Amino acid sequence: YTRDKDSEGIYSAKLNLKTGKLTKPVLAAKGDNPSFLTILPNEKFLLAVEETNDYEGEPSGSVVSYSINASDGSLIVSDRISTKGGAPCHISSDQAGRHVFFANYVGGSVGGVSVDEKGKLKLSSFIQHTGSSILPRQKSPHAHSIDIDPSGKHVVCADLGLDKVVIYDFDSEAGKLTVNEPGFAKVKPGNGPRHFAFSPDGKYGYTNNEITSSVTAFEFDSTLGALKEVQ
């Protein structure tokens, strides 16, 4: 996404809250194909995935933490860590800002990373998906997004290759992800779920399906961590 001849990494712009106008973007930090970003709740750190398949000689991408200069929007690298899988395409944070989660598209895997008060990173979880679905582009898992539910107890991943929304239990103290039981919700074969969003009250969840340009709606039981399709 960002490896063309003109792009050098992550850019920032200032927003005028009265007029809605943005200033011309300026380089905030150089990076290797950064594709998705999240800012921690304390607004001190920005986390990015670098969507590569060649991190330090491994078929992997990386998670990078940056400290934010609030005065000019510039970023300084605090730490970098391998995602243990290729082409990480999404990253999100828990409510406390102590942990982030990543999804590897090519690797078909997900993981969790702990973030300390200095922005240092430590891999806390890694889970490899297995399986396939019906279309040629679904011959293997393709984890496309990963998000925590409003209760902070569960994390879900939309996997385009499996036609599933995979569900994990989350231990916020240890930063550990474990596969939940029942473990996943299916969408119609060939739909290809890409991203997932919870309603603010946590009672519903929605996935947009990339291949069929559709949306699937679910009821969410936050006690069990279970999704039930309703539309």
Q: Each PLM stretch: what is its role?
A:
Residues T2-K5, E51-G57, V106-S109, L162-K164, ...:
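Short glycine/acidic-enriched loop and turn motifs that connect beta-strands
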Residues G9-Y11, S62-V64, S109-G111, K164-V166, ...:
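A short loop-to-beta-strand structural motif that recurs across blades of beta-propeller domains
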Residues K14-G20, Y66-G73, G112-K122, Y168-L177, ...:
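Short loop/turn segments immediately following beta-strands, especially the blade-tip
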Residues T23-A29, I76-I81, S125, G131-P136, ...:
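A short beta-strand motif characteristic of beta-propeller blades
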Residues T23-G97:
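Blade-loop segments of beta-propeller domains
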Residues G31-N42, K84-Q95, G131-G152, V187-Y204:
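Beta-rich, blade/repeat-based domains predominating
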Residues S74-S145:
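Asp-box/WD-like beta-propeller blade repeats and closely related beta-sheet repeat scaffolds
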